[in-house]
Amino acid sequence: MAGKARVHELAKELGVTSKEVLNKLAEQGEYVKSASSTVEAPVARRLRDAFPKSGGKKGGGDSNGRAGGAKPAPPRPPESSGRTEAQAPKPGPKPGPRTETPSGERPKPGPKPGPKPGPKAPAPETKPFEEAPAPAAKADAPAQPRSEQPRSEQPRSEQPRSEQPRSERSGPKPGGPKPGPKPGPKPGPRGGGDADAGVVPPKPQSPKPGPRSPRVGNNPFGVGSGAPAQRPPRPGPGGGQRQGGQGPGRGGPQGGRPDRQGGGGQGAGTAPAGGDRAPRGEGGGGGNRPNPGMMPPRPNPGMMPSRPARSGGGPGGGRGGGRGGPGGGGGGRPGGGGGGGRPGGGGGGFRGGGGPGAGAGTGAPAGGGFRGRPGGGGRPGGPGGRGGAAGAFGRPGGPARRGRKSKRQKRQEYMDNMQAPSVGGVRLPRGNGESVRLRRGASLTDFAEKINANPASLVQAMFHLGEMVTATQSVSDEILELLGSEMNYKVEMVSPEDEDRELLESFDISFGDPGSSDEELMSRPPVVTVMGHVDHGKTRLLDTIRKANVQAGEAGGITQHIGAYQVITELEGNERPITFIDTPGHEAFTAMRARGAKSTDIAVLVVAADDGVMPQTVEALNHAQAAGVPIVVAVNKIDVEGANPAKVRQQLTEYNLVAEEYGGETMFVDISARQGTNIESLLEAILLTADATLDLRANPSMEAQGVAIEAHLDRGRGPVATVLVQRGTLRVGDSVVAGNAFGRVRRMINEHDEDVTEALPSRPVQVIGFTSVPGAGDTFLVVDEDRVARQIADRRGARIREAQNAAKRKRVSLEDLDKVLKETNQLNLIIKGDNSGTVEALEESLTKIEVGEEVELRVIHRGVGGINESDINLATAENTIVLGFNVRAEGKAAEVANREGVEIRYYSVIYRAIEDIEQALKGMLKPEYEEVELGRAEVREVFKSSKVGTIAGCMVTDGIMRRNAKARLLRDNVVISENLTVTSLKRFKDDATEVRDGFECGLTLSYSDIKVDDIIETYEMREKPRA
């Protein structure tokens, strides 16, 4: 075999299955992956040497209990084609050839098992290729000359064949078989007639017992024998070596042609009509005496069957009986029963398991099959199913057929495909109004996982909908809702609170009281938030209560931070603590006021008696009412000239705050924070309201939970967060997580700058130990270990970034694409502040500035702490302005900024920063121009010049005509041409820069169709100052 041999080629050559070759190679320590793999020449040589030993054992013995008179024939020399010939028969599937049984065992007398075929009995050698047997020319000629001559000498066959003497093989005929005139087994001169090398004793249930009852051939590959589908002969031992070798299938009407499925064989069965019966002594009738013209065609791969052969044994006894008569049984390999005919046949054996063949029209009690399993049988009466051939060309049992779809199934699939939405040719899943919950900033991959779809299909669908997004890109809520509506899904965006709750539940953590008993609950101080308009005296009121002066330390006299304090007051002789939270009143601190209202028990609304209700007063009132907290109104500045407390009561009545003296439930207290008037009455009103309307109890034994009111970056202490404990007790050493910041409590400081070791409910403290600055308003909670805190913080940070990316991405449709592509001026900012609440308020206020679509503001970075070198480096790369709010440049940052030309602006009052940025944005606007008319001239004459073109002789009737000015041409008060230019202007023969009204001039325009009496109007574009 030239080159490297493949496993299935070696299996053909050795006459075994590919599985056995693979097993043998594994035993030899060679790893081969599959039947199509190649093996090296030394490995193939060892494989060939190994198989005769094992094959001789299997093939030489008489596995079916036959007489051992047959001797193995000597091995054949290699044929002229150079193909190596294996020295062993097929090891597993075919036991030794049947030797002839004594004549006494047969129902038919005669020297059938004559001694002649004895020496030429089955040769236990296999041939590389098993060809279709040639028809026997003369059935009574001895087979001795044929076994000595290699098959390669014959012109119609390429492979050498070892011959076996034909044993008698007769199939009972339905019409009464006649015994052949030559009962003795006389081998024919041609190997093709060796179809019956072994004798099978007839079954007792044969319908024609006695001397006239022939035996059924034993061909495991006969149609209907329970063997695998018939196929053309493979390389291997010739028909003379096999039990019932291959002979011409010539039963019945097909007596003269070989069988197309498996090659005909002179089998036992004969057709009731058709060709002449062969003598009984020749092993069954197969037609006329064989002759060379009946040789089958040479085997080739094209003869492989494309589908399993039909059941029903052929009249021949070869590897496959043809489509023979009703009782014909195909001869098989050693050990196999005869293939049953159409009425019923025995099972064909594959590996020595088949019982004796059945007679015509009867089922075989023991069928062959794969490895001796029951199988075989004809179409109507066969006892079992087909066997199977294992090897490189298929799995055992034949190819599995896939059932055809029913019409109902096809119709249902068609209807499903018709109802499935198709966007741009992409099939999408159909949702029947189902709800899909997605988090903020989700990607198309997240959406596809929810609906079990392909993300690439959603990307393609979005492209056809005019949206260009990737599968992993965070997309906005409206894009997800648009895509969901196309597929009939209802997209629900998870709120940040629900998303955070689901995140905590994944760690078996719940935020809130898990349900403490009454014994565990203890009373706590009320948390009071002071709210109101700017400059109405909120901080002065707290200073008076605390007997401190905080207002003097605030820039501009306005509060720009949230301050938290706890004071002790007396009520009915008992000292009662009250926690106060001071919120900014400036309009920029809306978010701070909202956070203060959410984390409070009672809201104190401070209104100046001289100013009355102001816009921030209404806003603070709305925050308190939205949070559902009771309100106590403090009418301040009653000592100021022009104060009118009654007016304040009347105005607040419009906002559902009715004073008690007017029959309402809201307590009004007239105070003077500067003079300290009625402060005790205000504190008493706060405590009475808390006792009357609130159940102020908390469980101090649980793990601490609360809210971060504000946070900042301290230069010496790092991130510092002011937290308000709402439940539980916070202790030094606890692992805490607040928003996307986490850490371990290293130190806690109260409002008097004193260290404390624990903080009970309603106690505000400053916590040191966070790894980063938490966001103002973030909830904090204590967890078991740092690892859990880090994981929660990381997931929160990733969620926040995705939501920000989705919000930044503006939805751009194809109609708005031209606007997007226009060049716009952009002002980049870096904001650094002293605490997170101030930075948030400043950024929110700056982004609300609107000066036009041509200029936009972009905050590329924000942070808490001083301005450092990394901020300057980022500003250098992005051409950015750095804003420092209550902070300064650290270290060499100022020096680097001067060297790189980065502008740093420092602010301490928020509204000044807002004004400066608004002016800067207006300065970046493109100038606006307006048209200003210069003059008009009437065309009196038109001259043609080959050098300069058309010359208009004009009289200036109004204004001036100026060279290089813009002009338009009017004819009968209709604009003929626009955007023209006065290219030349002359007064007589002299060039002129301008010509005033009342003078004549000659001019040329960038337009040649000028006629007499046309009007030339000149104008110029002047920049229009912005309001």
UniProtKB/Swiss-Prot annotation:
| Signal peptide range | none
Organism domain of life: Bacteria
Region of interest (G5), residue spans: 672-674
Q: State where GTP binds.
A: 532-539, 582-586, 636-639
Question: What are the subcellular locations of this protein?
Answer: Cytoplasm
Q: What is its main location?
A: cytoplasm
> Per the record, GO CC terms?
cytosol
Question: tr-type G domain location, by residue?
Answer: 523-695
- Pfam families, per the entry: EF-G_D2 (PF22042), GTP_EFTU (PF00009), IF-2 (PF11987), IF2_N (PF04760)
Matching Gene3D superfamilies:
1.10.10.2480, P-loop containing nucleotide triphosphate hydrolases (3.40.50.300), Translation factors (2.40.30.10), Translation initiation factor IF- 2, domain 3 (3.40.50.10050)
- Where is the stretch described as G1? 532-539
Bias class Basic and acidic residues marks the residues at 148-171
Annotated stretches, region: G4: 636-639
Return the Basic residues bias intervals: 401-410
Alphabetical list of PANTHER family matching this protein: TR-TYPE G DOMAIN-CONTAINING PROTEIN, TRANSLATION INITIATION FACTOR IF-2-RELATED
The family assignment reads: Belongs to the TRAFAC class translation factor GTPase superfamily. Classic translation factor GTPase family. IF-2 subfamily.
List the protein's name. Translation initiation factor IF-2
Species the sequence originates in: Saccharopolyspora erythraea (strain ATCC 11635 / DSM 40517 / JCM 4748 / NBRC 13426 / NCIMB 8594 / NRRL 2338)
